[in-house]
């Protein structure tokens, strides 16, 4: 694995000293090409099929194909990598090289937080407290009505935690200053808040 240069290396947006952690969120760069997964995946139409990692893995890690050998570039921080090996994990390589080069890639940080949330939280429908309640209700037919109410409440909770843009992912980002939420994928495609239509300049992690 090797880097092949980065753009905007002198841009304060990408310096660790200006990552916004001390002033209520990370400043986000908007209106970037290839902000969506599908757009990035389409850039790999000429990706040699025999090469690994796959174009899907690279796209999910934020990369687009430059149509030169196996060179790819992050849509957000412009990090460029080449000379991929079969054992390489695109996201881990992205994370490693941005850390080594002291690039503050908000896309990498967003995926890392989303992975943390997935690894440390139970599914809405597999909450251990809810499961225990449901088990107790199964043994008591007189409480069937309460069981239905509990299940409806659980479903409602899941709806609240679902991104209202894609209706697929869990919300993990807060738009600043309006306070509305988004998932880690949709936030990079937004120009204004889709709920209140106001502009936002930063995002922050949402702990639920």
Swiss-Prot record:
Protein name in UniProt: Apoptosis inhibitor 193R
BIR repeat copies, ranges: 37-108
Classification via Pfam families: BIR (PF00653), zf-C3HC4_3 (PF13920)
Zinc finger RING-type: from-to: 163-197
GO MF term list: zinc ion binding
Repeat positions for Sequence: 134-139, 140-145, 146-151
CDD domains: BIR
């Amino acid at each position: 694995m090797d880097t092949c240069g980065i753009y905007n290396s002198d841009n304060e947006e990408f310096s660790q000293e200006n990552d916004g952690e001390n002033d209520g969120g990370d400043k986000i760069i908007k209106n970037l090409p290839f902000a969506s997964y599908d757009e990035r995946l389409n850039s790999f139409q000429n990706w040699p099929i025999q090469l690994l990692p796959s174009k899907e893995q690279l796209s999910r890690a934020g990369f687009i194909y430059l149509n030169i050998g196996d060179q790819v570039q992050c849509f957000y921080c412009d990090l460029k990598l080449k000379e991929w090996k079969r054992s390489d994990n695109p996201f881990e390589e992205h994370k490693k090289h941005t850390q080594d080069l002291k690039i503050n890639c908000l896309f990498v940080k967003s995926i890392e937080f989303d992975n943390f949330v997935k690894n440390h939280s139970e599914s809405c429908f597999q909450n251990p407290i809810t499961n225990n309640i449901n088990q107790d209700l199964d043994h008591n037919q007189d409480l069937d009505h309460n069981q239905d109410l509990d299940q409806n409440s659980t479903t409602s909770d899941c709806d609240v935690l679902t991104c209202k843009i894609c209706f697929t992912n869990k919300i993990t980002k807060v738009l600043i200053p309006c306070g509305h939420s988004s998932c880690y994928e949709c936030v990079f495609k937004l120009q204004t808040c889709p709920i209140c239509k106001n502009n936002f300049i930063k995002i922050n992690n949402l702990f639920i």
